[in-house]
Design a protein with these regions (language model features):
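Residues that scaffold the ATP/ADP-binding catalytic core of kinase and kinase-like folds
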Residues: 12-14, 52, 125
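Active-site neighborhoods of divalent-metal-dependent phosphate/nucleic-acid chemistry enzymes
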Residues: 76-114
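Histidine- and aromatic-rich ligand-binding microenvironments
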Residues: 5-6, 41-42, 97-101, 119-120, ...
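Amphipathic alpha-helical segments within well-ordered protein domains
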Residues: 50-54, 90
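A generic structural signal for short hydrophobic patches within well-formed alpha-helices
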Residues: 10, 46, 122-123
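Short, well-structured N-terminal submotif of metal-dependent ribonuclease cores
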Residues: 1-41, 56-63
Length: 132
């Protein structure tokens, strides 16, 4: 079976905090893997986790993105193609547009839509229109 992970679970697995919930989340994940289950992480959960790691746990962009990238390589974990496009951008921690904006633009592009933004940095991405 495939289960979708909520941001609260992803944060426990990535940060180990609070310890009691993190231990329970890890046990559930490990039990699921042992049973042959898969776990999915949506783009929204990836974005929320990124911002939470940065702002509530005081990590740098590079640390937060590194944690998400490492987690995405875990057994039984799947993220979207949009996540893969964004997280594998060279020097994503310094990129403009950044991680979440790239996931968003990739998602719209996957749907055959053009992204409209007021941010000039979107000009660097395909299939975008910038209002300025």
């Amino acid at each position: 079976m495939t289960f979708g992970l909520d941001t609260s679970v992803v944060l426990r697995l990535l940060t180990g905090q609070p310890q009691d919930l993190a231990a329970k989340a890890l046990e559930r994940y490990q039990d699921g893997i042992a049973a042959g289950d898969d776990f999915s992480v949506s783009d929204l959960v990836a974005a929320e986790s990124y911002y939470a790691i940065r702002h509530h746990y005081g990590k740098t962009k590079e640390e937060a993105l590194g944690a998400l990238k490492s987690f995405s390589a875990g057994d039984g974990i799947s993220f979207s193609q949009n996540f893969a496009v964004a997280i594998n951008t060279p020097n994503i921690h310094k990129a403009s547009p950044g991680f979440v904006d790239r996931m968003l633009a990739s998602d719209y592009g996957e749907r055959g839509q053009i992204t409209i933004s007021c941010e000039k940095s979107f000009r660097r991405l395909p299939d975008t229109e910038v209002i300025s």
